[in-house]
A protein has these predicted regions:
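HDAC/HDAC-like amidohydrolase catalytic core signature
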Residues: 1-206
Length: 206
């Protein structure tokens, strides 16, 4: 961004630490307590083959959620037209009761719930364009008619979910699996022919 001259057009904000109550918007207290209790004082604790906790993992995860919620505040309150959160760890693989795929808390799902709870936003849409399918976000949105999840991702690939047939309880899930080697043309087609019509039908507020 600095090299291309965009840095001066950005307003930088440090990630604030989310309260644990925010995490509870999408994860049950038992799960939160398990994560907190699993954070080691040194070394690492493995939650699965891919996902581990180090002494700083909880702080990083809470700041990732805090950044996303602050971004929601800025956009909903009209302080910014858009926002980008450069945060780790990622979140889209974390399910309601399960950390996986390097993800501890589902950052974007929590931010969607935060927008609804804090600001009264009714309908929230999330588009995921990672190479891996966001199974956790899909699981959390599956049965909520006011949440919409769209994803472009490579299949077959971890975590193995994300087929076109996975539509959600209210047709609020849109999956556009791509194959290895697909490029910009296929990606644009998925957006224009599948995801945008789905968004137009859903009519999100955010």
């Amino acid at each position: 961004l600095q090299r291309e001259g965009f840095d001066g057009r950005l307003v930088r904000r440090d990630a604030e630490r989310a309260e644990l109550d925010f995490i509870g918007l999408m994860h049950p207290q038992k799960y939160i307590d398990q994560i907190v209790a699993s954070v080691p004082s040194s070394g690492i604790t493995r939650l699965d083959a891919d996902t581990c906790l180090s002494p700083g993992s909880l702080e990083a995860a809470l700041r990732a959620v805090g950044a996303a919620c602050s971004a929601v505040d800025a956009v909903v309150l009209g302080e910014s037209k858009n926002a980008f959160c450069a945060v780790r760890p990622p979140g889209h693989h974390a399910e309601t009761n399960q950390a996986m795929g390097f993800c501890i808390f589902n950052t974007v799902a929590i931010a969607a719930a935060y927008a609804r709870r804090r600001h009264g936003v009714e309908r929230v849409a999330v588009m995921d364009f990672d190479v891996h399918h966001g199974n956790g976000t899909q699981e959390m949105f599956w049965s909520d008619q006011n949440l919409f999840f769209a994803s472009t991702h490579q299949m077959p690939l971890y975590p193995g979910t994300g087929s076109k047939s996975e539509r959600g309880e209210f047709d609020n899930i849109v999956n556009c699996p791509l194959i290895a080697g697909d490029g910009s043309s296929e990606f644009r087609t998925a957006i224009s022919d599948v995801i945008l019509p789905g968004l137009e039908t859903f009519q999100p507020d955010l």
